[in-house]
Amino acid sequence: MNAAFIPVRGGSKSIPLKNIKPICGKPLVYWTVKAASLCKFIDVVYVATDSDLIRQTVEDFALDKVKVIGRSAQSASDTASTESAMLEFAESFDFDNIVLIQATSPLLTAEDLDRGFEIFAREDTDSVLSAVKQYRFNWSVDEKGIATPTNYDVFNRPRRQDFDGYLVENGAFYITSKADLLKSQNRVSGNIKPC
């Protein structure tokens, strides 16, 4: 069974209750919950929250496959990692594979998730993460303030059309098995492929 896990804290310090702020007429979290509920490979969507207001908001969506569950104060604290919430979930729920979905990715679609699960099904794949290809020239700055390019030779600057670019993790979703999550204590491990 494939489970989607969407952790949604009520205690954001930067933007209080950001996950239910309106984006295009719907609460922010609506867009990822809807995408997960429409994914053909996801059997159940768990939204884990410590907030009664978020719980009610998500329940009001009345979307198929969606269940709102509690989240401990410890796993919803300012210092808790997302992995701690995933591991807490894994201890209490039965599933084979998990897709962690960040509520703050409203442009995520069911088709994105479908592609992720298709990649995950390949024999040599242990985990999948969502990524975007970038075609930017990066620089780092040392302690003296001197800038140095990190991904190209400044004297042989490639044409953009000839530049291979690089992948950037975008944080929208991560897929792994329950067994690998428990073994590695991490959202991805083993042979990791991008989507």
Model-derived features: positions:
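N-terminal nucleotide-binding beta1-loop-alpha1 segment
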Residues: 1-16
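A structural signal for isolated positions on well-ordered beta-strands in alpha/beta enzyme cores
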Residues: 3-5, 44-46, 99, 128, ...
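Residues in the short beta-alpha loop(s) of Rossmann-like NAD(P)-binding domains
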Residues: 26, 49-52
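A short, N-terminal amphipathic alpha-helix
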Residues: 28-45, 56
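Short, high-confidence coil segments that cap the C-terminus of an alpha-helix
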Residues: 42, 95, 124-126
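Short phosphate-binding loop-to-helix
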Residues: 52-99, 108-115
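Conserved core of the sugar-phosphate nucleotidyltransferase
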Residues: 78-85, 106-193
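Active-site acidic Asp-centered loop
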Residues: 101-103
